[in-house]
Amino acid sequence: GGAVGADLAAADGALASGDGAPVVEILPVGLWLAPVRPSVCQLTVCAPGADFTTGQAMERNALIYAASTHTVVVRPRFRVGGTWTGAVDALRRRLGTLLVAGPPSDRAVATLVALGGVPLASVADMPAALMVEAPRPQPSLFGGSAVREPVLAFG
């Protein structure tokens, strides 16, 4: 994701794994405002000097879901904020597999799982969760290709 918190920790963990796999961050700000991370490919849809805005963060979240086979959602709040909105939108449009981290008793976690997310109670569950395939998009009634809505721009 490229934002502070869980996004930054995930990128740092991927770098620390030492397997040489590329690490990509999709930033919610312009490249001029992001700290330079030489081992990371940083992408943004923002102008180079653009500050953080909620709309740009929402657009960035939609791109992350659309580009990923699996996405981990951490600490969703029930019906509040960009994490919730992006997760529900990704589930509705079947954009990859959504892994939902948190206690099953949490209302937001339970709801996202009920909507099709995969529960991720602990890090130990990650290998099994990554084996879960995303639901296939519904075939079109008129041409054989899959129905897939465009990624929405929130900015």
Question: What is each of the regions a protein language model found here?
Answer:
Residues 1-155:
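Glycine-biased, small-residue-rich flexible motifs in mid-sequence functional cores and linkers
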